[in-house]
Curated annotation (Swiss-Prot):
Active site residues of this protein: 116 (n6-amp-lysine intermediate)
Annotated organism of origin: Haemophilus influenzae (strain ATCC 51907 / DSM 11121 / KW20 / Rd)
Protein name per Swiss-Prot or TrEMBL: DNA ligase
Reaction(s) the record says it catalyses: NAD(+) + (deoxyribonucleotide)n-3'-hydroxyl + 5'-phospho-(deoxyribonucleotide)m = (deoxyribonucleotide)n+m + AMP + beta-nicotinamide D-nucleotide
Source species taxonomy: Bacteria, Pseudomonadati, Pseudomonadota, Gammaproteobacteria, Pasteurellales
Pfam families: BRCT (PF00533), DNA_ligase_aden (PF01653), DNA_ligase_OB (PF03120), DNA_ligase_ZBD (PF03119), HHH_2 (PF12826), HHH_5 (PF14520), Nlig-Ia (PF22745)
Occurrences of domain BRCT (ranges): 592-670
Molecular-function GO terms, alphabetical: DNA binding; DNA ligase (NAD+) activity; metal ion binding
Gene that specifies this protein: ligA
Alphabetized SUPFAM superfamilies for the sequence: BRCT domain (SSF52113), DNA ligase/mRNA capping enzyme, catalytic domain (SSF56091), Nucleic acid-binding proteins (SSF50249), RuvA domain 2-like (SSF47781)
Alphabetical list of NCBIfam families matching this protein: dnlj (TIGR00575), PRK07956.1 (NF005932)
Length: 670
């Protein structure tokens, strides 16, 4: 072997290891820049020496020519579907059938429990460790050849990470698109006047069935393996869970939520845990898959028709349902944004009754081609506001009415305008508009802003409706007599509200900036502004160039801030707030070079009382830390707020330094 071949082999081996750490272990040992440097070095060497190019090189994920169509692949072992359960009773009946069928019944039965990913099932064949073929599930017997497209997925290894690969190994898994990637994909499509996808599953399906793999390579797809088909030249572990861990050890990604459960009660506990975590996972699931863990027991139980007896999918309540669109109302937000809200025939979706859904903006109404009277597909996922994702146009009644976007504000009758390049139309009424005034005041008192506990949305609505307050400063001028005259406001409640207002006068500069409600200035940006300028006067006097020196403040946000301080009304409100006693201490954050967190990996868990999670994350990043979402042996610190859960427990198990919120704040300030 020549020196060049040895160098190429070493580069490929190193890059495969880094890909494994990044995509499978979620624990990279080097920064992205180092991977990129080695990748480009390998690519340059391969261009200089094409005679040594191999098909399993990390550089060869993309390169196949577009296909004229997909050829068919017959599955040597059929890819079966699963029976479904929709209630605890149906799951318990499944367990009873297993217990009745087994000759020697282990006590308790052990299950391998997995999230049921909402993607596309695929089969990937490795021959002597090299990816040679991939197919869709199809009808279970025959699928489409998607080898070129599967090769483009970054977490799918082109070469297994083992020196002793099986002669043939068929990996079965689910390809899906995480939420973050889906949002980026649709954002790009909107910016380039391309068609958007209705949901991540459709996006994943459309991406896998591209005839041009170069297009697929630009789509943020992910594989999670859930089983093994063909296995030749290897002694596989004797349990399903151990097989998944073995796959992980040779470079195949598996889902991190997989758990072993003993007995039906533990399995049902897993089902509820995953259901509660569903909205925070970052990808779509529609239930759990529950499998007998022991392979010998699986073989004993066998199959019925097209499903195994040893596994079942326990589905979550439906997240999508059909209903009728009865009307559309237009609501006004604190920045004047006009949002169309669909008034629906009430329908039970994902555990709750839904009667309203957002239609986002005029473009969305046009895209959906929706009319009052239509039958619509409503989707509700976790805590996300229900939305209409489709229309059954073939069911449109003759008396359907078009949705007319208003030209004047439905609250104050001011003109509605839409700035070129923006999707949102806005009322021009400003604080003259009662709706904007209410929402601006609700934002001002919210937990992440001034955190005024005793003053809620309903109280603000009464105060605005009765013309008792017009600006945030007016809140601090309220007295007991005024408050006790309001509906449902007794003396005790009024005293609590006044005490909350008094306590809120002592705040932080970051919270105060966020509370002002400047467009596109979220809590993280407010924190960056406070840390950069140190004082309100310095921020107020900053020019556009100075504003753009703040992290995460670009030209658009800088303009918003600059214009805010050039409005005499805004300056007057701020001065009035200061006059009413609103104040803060000047806290200097330590420079990145002199703090405990520089170049460290930090995990946040629990509820922080002094700042929001995003605020803390932005602060840590400014200090030079890497903020991770999961605890591992590479974690340096865990900052634990109230009600910290499994991350705190894992940190203690791994002897990782745990800081309270107070200890964290003491470390970063002086």
């Amino acid at each position: 072997m020549t020196n060049i071949q040895t160098q190429l082999d070493n580069l490929r081996k190193t890059l495969r290891q880094y890909e494994y750490e990044y995509h499978v272990l979620d624990n990279p040992s080097v920064p992205d820049s180092e991977y990129d440097r080695l990748f480009h070095q390998l690519k340059a060497l391969e261009l200089e020496h094409p005679e040594f190019l191999t098909s399993d090189s990390p550089t060869q994920r993309v390169g196949a020519k577009p296909l004229s169509g997909f050829s068919q692949i017959r599955h040597e072992i059929p890819m079966l579907s699963l029976d479904n359960a929709f209630s605890d009773a149906e799951f318990n009946a499944f367990v009873k059938r297993i217990e009745d069928r087994l000759i020697l019944l282990p006590k308790p039965l052990t299950f391998c429990c997995e999230p049921k990913l909402d993607g596309l099932a695929v089969s990937i064949l490795y021959v002597n460790g090299e990816l040679t073929q991939a197919a869709t599930r199809g009808d279970g017997t025959t699928g489409e050849d998607i080898t070129a497209n599967i090769r483009t997925i970054r977490n799918v290894p082109l070469q297994l990470l083992t020196d002793n690969p099986p002669a043939r190994l068929e990996v079965r898994g689910e390809v899906f698109m995480p939420h973050a990637g889906f949002e980026r994909l649709n954002k790009y499509a909107l910016e380039h006047n391309e068609k958007t996808f209705a949901n991540p599953r459709n996006a994943a399906a459309g991406s896998l069935r591209q005839l041009d793999p170069n297009i697929t390579s630009k789509r943020p797809l992910v594989l999670n393996a859930y089983g093994i088909g063909i296995a030749e030249g290897v002694d596989l572990p004797t349990t399903h869970y151990a097989r998944l861990q073995w796959l992980k050890s040779i470079g195949i990604p598996v889902n991190p939520e997989i758990r072993l459960c003993n007995g039906a009660d533990e399995v049902l506990g897993f089902y509820r845990d995953i259901q509660n975590k569903r909205s925070s996972l970052g990808y779509d699931i529609d239930g759990t898959v529950l499998k007998i863990n022991d392979i010998a027991l699986q073989n004993e139980l066998g199959f019925i028709s097209k499903a195994p007896r040893w596994a079942i999918a326990y589905k979550f309540p439906a997240q999508e349902e059909l209903t009728l669109l009865n009307d559309v109302e237009f609501q006004v937000g604190r920045t004047g944004a006009i949002t169309p809200v669909a008034k629906l025939e009430p329908v039970f979706v994902a555990g709750v009754t839904v009667s309203n859904a957002t239609l986002h903006n005029g473009d969305e109404i046009e895209r959906l081609n929706i009319a009052i009277g239509d039958t619509v597909v409503i989707r509700r996922a976790g805590d996300v506001i229900p939305q209409i994702i489709g229309v059954l146009h073939e069911r449109r009644p003759d008396n359907a009415k078009p949705i007319i976007f208003p030209t004047n504000c439905p609250v104050c009758d001011s003109q509605i305008i839409r700035i070129e390049g923006e999707a949102v139309a806005r009322c021009t009424g400003g604080l003259f508009c009662a709706a904007q005034r209410k929402e601006a005041l609700k934002h001002f008192v919210s937990r992440k802003a001034m955190d005024i506990d005793g003053v809620g949305g309903k109280l603000i609505e009464q105060l605005v409706d009765r013309e008792l307050i017009h600006t945030p400063a007016d809140l601090f001028k309220l007295d007991l007599t005024t408050l006790t005259r309001l509906e449902r406001m007794g003396a005790k409640s009024a005293e609590n509200a006044l005490n909350s207002l008094e306590n809120a006068k002592s705040t932080t500069l970051a919270r105060f900036i966020f509370a002002l409600g400047i467009r596109e200035v979220g809590e993280a940006t407010a924190l960056n502004l406070a840390n950069h300028f140190k004082t309100l006067d310095a921020l107020k006097d900053a020019n556009l160039e100075e504003l753009q020196q703040v992290p995460d403040v670009g030209e658009v946000v800088a303009n918003r801030i600059f214009i805010f301080w050039r409005e005499a009304h805004n300056v007057a409100v701020v001065e009035d707030l200061i006059a009413q006693g609103v104040h803060w201490e000047t806290v200097e954050v330590k420079e990145a070079s002199e703090n405990l967190f520089k170049d460290k990996t930090v995990v946040l868990t629990g509820t922080l009382t002094q700042m929001g999670r995003n605020e803390a994350k932005a602060l840590l990043q400014q200090l030079g830390a890497k903020v991770s979402g999961s605890v591992s042996s590479k974690t340096d610190f865990v900052i634990a707020g109230d009600a910290a859960g499994s991350k705190l427990a894992k940190a203690q198990e791994l002897n990782i330094t745990v800081l309270t919120e107070e200890e964290f704040l003491a470390q970063i300030t002086r």
